[in-house]
Amino acid sequence: GYVNNRRSNLPYGETDGTWKSHGGFSKVGTCSLPGYSGKVFEPNDEYKGDFARIYFYMATCYEDKIASWSSDMLSHNSYPAYKQWVIDMLLRWAKNDPVSKKEIDRNNAVQRVQGNRNPFVDYPGLEQYIWGNKTDVAFSYDNYDSTIPDPTPDPKPDPNPDPNPDPTPDPNPDPTPTPEPSEGEQVYTLVA
């Protein structure tokens, strides 16, 4: 829509904003972070963590290609892939905007269609083991330290849980229908 049009292909960043969306939730302006002084797009706080986790996932999925991409956010190498000001910003965004139900639902829908998942949604804080303050700690499920509080314990836990339970089938396995394309729009089909 309109806000995405205003973003154009600007890098994400933080700004006081010379342009602000209705309500001031998203902004465009000169970057206020040390390390970059160009024009940036700052998304609504509600979505900053979403973008951070998407960008972390993109860097891991396309590690063999990202060095050749062009963006003011990128360091033109496969690791760390992003410039330090971007890493610091994305780590902060991921911490300050925890994984939401909307992200979990999107991750589940993507898995149904594409067969893959974003591990940064499934394991909040995983980015700390790759770019943050836990890079000297080998990630494993045993030492994984989630930034999300544990859910309320089951008042009647199963005394003999199945170590390999079958996943619960999705009650609504059909993906959301897609609207018909407008004239001139291209249609792409995802192949699993």
List the model feature ranges, each with a label:
Residues 1-150:
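Domain-level detector of nuclease and nuclease-like folds
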Residues 150, 154, 158, 162, ...:
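Asp/Glu-rich intrinsically disordered low-complexity tracts
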Residues 179-192:
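Secondary-structure capping and domain/repeat boundary segments
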